[in-house]
């Protein structure tokens, strides 16, 4: 029987308009199969990425790590499943490609991997910065988003203090002072004082960690291109409609006031809506889940959730990060 999604908003020219940019301008969700030898992976888009969130589509073992690579740290990767130091390896970034080395981390022979690649720039709502802490003295870190960030991801890189290299997540709609951790399933915790003075040009961090090196990733919603929000679930199989005002290519999701998984869904994992959904766990060692739980349709204006599970749509609040498969008419990404 053909599966026909229902209950979502109909596309009209008034809602979406005519796309002004090619879909590949700034975000790519894609898969590749490891060869065991160094090679370039085609992202399916033309732009040169600056950031890669990757997941081998198997349970994590000694050769199968989830992590983040970026253009500020060429030749290094960061594990998103654990609070561990950065390690040598990673990828190189080229126009429309990522270059993987011969190591098993991203290139295990025969293993399929998923990547979410982003381009840095004001018009894409994404920036990165490295900074040194200064003991208990707050440090002002500049960014170039052209407006206040909606979300910040940051962590320790190196230094004598040996600070816990957790992946801290700040969002403007979390309770004041509260943070999540990307490398944890825990609910948001009180991190008052760590992130303050979030503004259009800078953010103040107080890491209380000597002169250690940290890295921050800044995200800002761009109309028609990306969205970073917190919304309530309805605990109903006829779930909420996440109105992004664009057709999503990738969505990252986490309950904020409940212990629960970070989950990522994308059009690379499921090119079409169907009665099951492939879901990966960026911060857990589990293999991808394929089934009717976490079911959600990617539609013209957003995501229609069709599940009442606590991970995606219980009676809790959820951080939702979405990037467009097709940017809408009002995107700045031109």
Feature-to-residue mapping (PLM):
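Surface-exposed molecular-recognition determinants
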Residues: 2-334
